[in-house]
């Protein structure tokens, strides 16, 4: 299973229609003047944010998007029809960059937001434009211009306020499933989650807050190891991170350090993002082992971890209280 959150496409505006050479042909007007109409303008290519889309999967199978051309002009100064814009739907949270230069062209965040990425060519001029005192029967017209053509890089970043991070198998999918109505695939082996899962958790006010279960990181993720860069970018837009540590892992403290190191190496302000350290799977620990592990995690991170059992539903109210407090809701 592959989460398509990057795509490369080419967009091409429609070509303008040609102007034409024509003359009035009317009864009793033996020498009618020029009447060639202009060509219509080529259609633009427009990207539009759509809240019903979750991935860029559609762009895996189609890479070239060409808008329709304008129609050629007609006699009697009739202008050819201009092309209607080609509207391409993309998920909310899609960044659009010029593939060659890397320049950010736009960030489509809100539903219905639009960005014109290739303008159509202007229509050519008919010979009616070239009538003058010195030339009463011009035979000149111009062709329509080509539309713009650009290679684009699309990147999708999840729009979630809270990101749940941790090494594979830390229990992130279980946590988001019990906190929200999301039902991600859950199994007891690493890398079950290959697609970021979104869930809406209700605040005390009744409003919803979007949580994202970010697939498991591994050492070297910031340099692109595993699924690193593909998923670290999704954390950038979150306001708060829940760092989940598996209490049943061979080295929970080492796991904590791996994730912290990757956040620091990736940059983009992630290491300074407000974060809650949460120790999951308390059902695997006796009292002495729990207290010892909590002390070691606190010594390593400088923060006292919250203790929960996602599978048993324990400690979740206290966790959410901390989340709402840090979000200021």
Swiss-Prot record:
Residues reported to bind ATP:
166-173, 191-195, 213-216, 280-283, 309-311
Q: Which UniProt keywords apply?
A: ATP-binding, Cytoplasm, GTP-binding, Hydrolase, Magnesium, Metal-binding, Nucleotide-binding
Q: What range(s) does the OBG-type G domain occupy? A: 160-328
- Per the UniProt record, which EC number(s) apply here? 3.6.5.-
One function term, GO molecular function aspect = magnesium ion binding
Residues annotated as domain Obg: 1-159
Q: Name one GO biological process term.
A: ribosome biogenesis
Enzyme kind, highest EC tier? hydrolase
Q: Which GO terms describe its cellular component?
A: cytoplasm
Give the primary localization class: cytoplasm
Locations listed in the record: Cytoplasm
Q: Which cofactor does it need?
A: Mg(2+)
Concerning its family, UniProt says: Belongs to the TRAFAC class OBG-HflX-like GTPase superfamily. OBG GTPase family.
Role this protein plays = An essential GTPase which binds GTP, GDP and possibly (p)ppGpp with moderate affinity, with high nucleotide exchange rates and a fairly low GTP hydrolysis rate. Plays a role in control of the cell cycle, stress response, ribosome biogenesis and in those bacteria that undergo differentiation, in morphogenesis control.
Supply the name of the protein. GTPase Obg
